[in-house]
């Protein structure tokens, strides 16, 4: 799956030619799509409205949580109740609800097409566990289970998308600023894998220089 995303992402980058462009805004596309494939079982093209909307909302969310006033609110959360609009709290809540609604819509679609004998992805497996849970105190029980599933999906995307894409963006910046290192990495890849093979985890022991630099 990761290799498939790499092929798609490389094709996207090739459309920009040899001129400069902002890669930071593009790096989230393969990450979010890979997460969506694991959790919801859908593989989107990068211009798909659902993927673009999810990426837009996630980007807005991360931009807002990095504001100085938000950091201030972590220390004094009660202030948000006094001036929610001024501090942007209302907009933060709206963006969060928009993302959660997307998650709930996917959960609803999965419930309507669920085959307990053929689970397709993370959501299906979670829904099956909810169906099988009879203990009211369990986190998988009934509507509480559905709410927890939606929250888990949100956590996966928040924790997994921006962190991974930012790490990769900085790795690319490091290569751009250090072309000698980039040349050595490329030479090792070409020597071990050849010009066309896509690397996998099984190749890691054979790529010590690349492993250290990344």
Q: Which positions does each model-derived feature cover?
A:
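Transmembrane helix-loop-helix
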Residues: 1-17
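Short, polar/flexible loop-turn hinges at active-site or ligand-entry regions and domain interfaces
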Residues: 1, 17-21, 40-49, 89-90
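Extended, well-ordered alpha-helical segments in internal regulatory regions
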Residues: 34-42, 159, 176
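Short His/Asp/Glu-rich catalytic/ion-coordination signatures at enzyme active sites or charged loops
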Residues: 78-91
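Cytochrome P450 substrate-recognition site 1
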Residues: 1, 22-23, 27-34, 50-80
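Hydrophobic alpha-helical cores of multi-pass transmembrane domains in eukaryotic membrane proteins
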Residues: 2-6, 27, 31-35, 153, ...
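Conserved cytochrome P450 catalytic core segment spanning the I/J/K helices
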Residues: 18, 22, 32, 70-71, ...
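Cytochrome P450 catalytic-core helices
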Residues: 163-181, 186-188
């Amino acid at each position: 799956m990761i290799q498939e995303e790499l092929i798609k992402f490389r094709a996207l980058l090739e459309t920009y030619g040899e001129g400069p462009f902002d890669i930071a805004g593009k790096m989230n596309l393969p990450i979010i799509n890979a997460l969506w494939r694991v959790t919801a079982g859908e593989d989107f093209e990068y211009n798909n409205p659902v993927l673009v909307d999810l990426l837009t909302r996630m980007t807005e969310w991360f931009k807002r949580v990095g504001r100085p006033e938000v950091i201030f609110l972590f220390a004094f959360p009660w202030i948000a109740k006094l001036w929610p609009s001024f501090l942007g709290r209302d907009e933060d809540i709206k963006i969060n609800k928009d993302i959660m609604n997307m998650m709930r819509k996917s959960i609803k679609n999965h419930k309507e097409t669920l085959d307990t004998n053929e689970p397709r992805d993370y959501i299906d497996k979670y829904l099956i566990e909810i169906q099988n849970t009879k203990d009211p105190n369990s986190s998988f029980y009934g509507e509480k289970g559905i709410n927890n599933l939606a929250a888990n999906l949100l956590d996966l995307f928040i924790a997994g998308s921006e962190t991974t894409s930012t790490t990769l963006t900085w790795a690319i910046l490091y290569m751009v600023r250090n072309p000698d290192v980039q040349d050595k990495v490329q030479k090792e890849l070409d020597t071990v894998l050849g010009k066309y093979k896509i690397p996998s985890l099984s190749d890691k022991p054979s790529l010590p220089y690349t492993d250290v630099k990344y």
